[in-house]
Structures are given as structure tokens and as C-alpha cells.
């Protein structure tokens, strides 16, 4: 029973880490990646469809993303979706493909993105602590219902705290790496 709680706790904390990694991937760093446009949805015959499913999306260099639609009639829809996404660039439509030119980031922009990353990391820490709280409550209930002894309860709480500390440490490492990536000129 207690081992199931440990596994469930670890699994949920791992999901929080994966969510943080996805959030971090959407942040712009010094080098442009296609992750910046991952959340953009294009109106594809009335259905919101991810941009990477209606065309080829590649980073041609450190400041440019090129989008080649599989159907030429989607160019204006893709252009509109990019403008509505408000990612800080205007699409450049040349009739065959769309280019996004990202200007170099200023130090103020970098600091603002670091703030966003810090908030994302803090949200992940809070989520992990909430998972710990749920697990501890389950352990307390088992102890209260006399399914485990007080000593087993103490050991279980210590193990849950260790799992929590490990995951909080991973959040901190991810944030430090992302911060360094953002601030790198």
C-alpha cells in the first residue's frame, strides 16, 4: 500500500517535471527553435490544427524560422494564425513559404523571459509540494486507520520528503540551465 503511494507520488512529480520542460521549450532563447511556434493552431478547413501538421517548420538559422505549407492555399491562414499568436514577429509571406525573422533579443527582453521561466519553475515547485501533501495525507489516513504503524508512517513521510527534495532539485537544475541558455548572447 505504501509502495503504491510512493510510485504514484513519483509518477505525478515526474509529470510536473515534463510539463515544466514543455513550458520551458516554448520560451525564446538566444537561438530560435521551432518550439516557439508549437502552440500555434491554424484554421485547417474549420479545424484548429497545429502548425507543424499543415506544413514543414524549420529553423534555417539562429534568427529565422521557415514554414512551407503542404497546401499553398493555407499561406494566408498560417500568416493570420502567426499574427494572432502574438509571438513578437510579423510573418513574411513570399507566395511559396513564410519566413519569421526574429530580431536579436535585448537584455531587457532576456530578463523578462528569465522572469517567466522563474514563475514557471515556481509553479512546478508548488505542484510538486501539493503532490507531497496529498501523499502525506494518504499516509496519515493509513496510520489513523491502523493499517500501518507509527514507525512505518514516519519512514513513509521521510521517503516522500526525499522524493520531493529530489524533484525540487531537478526543477532548480532545469531552471538554472534554462536561465543560462536565455542569458547566453
UniProtKB/Swiss-Prot annotation:
Name used for this protein in its record: Ribosome-recycling factor
GO cellular component term, pick one: cytosol
Pfam families noted in UniProt: RRF (PF01765)
Keyword ATP-binding carried by entry: no
Similarity comment text for this entry: Belongs to the RRF family.
BP GO terms, sorted: cytoplasmic translational termination
Keywords attached to this entry: Cytoplasm, Protein biosynthesis
S-S bridge residues: none
Positions of transmembrane segments: none
HAMAP family: RRF
Keyword Lipoprotein: no
Function: Responsible for the release of ribosomes from messenger RNA at the termination of protein biosynthesis. May increase the efficiency of translation by recycling ribosomes from one round of translation to another.
GO molecular function: ribosomal large subunit binding
NCBIfam families given in the database record: frr
Organism: Sulfurovum sp. (strain NBC37-1)
Subcellular compartments: Cytoplasm
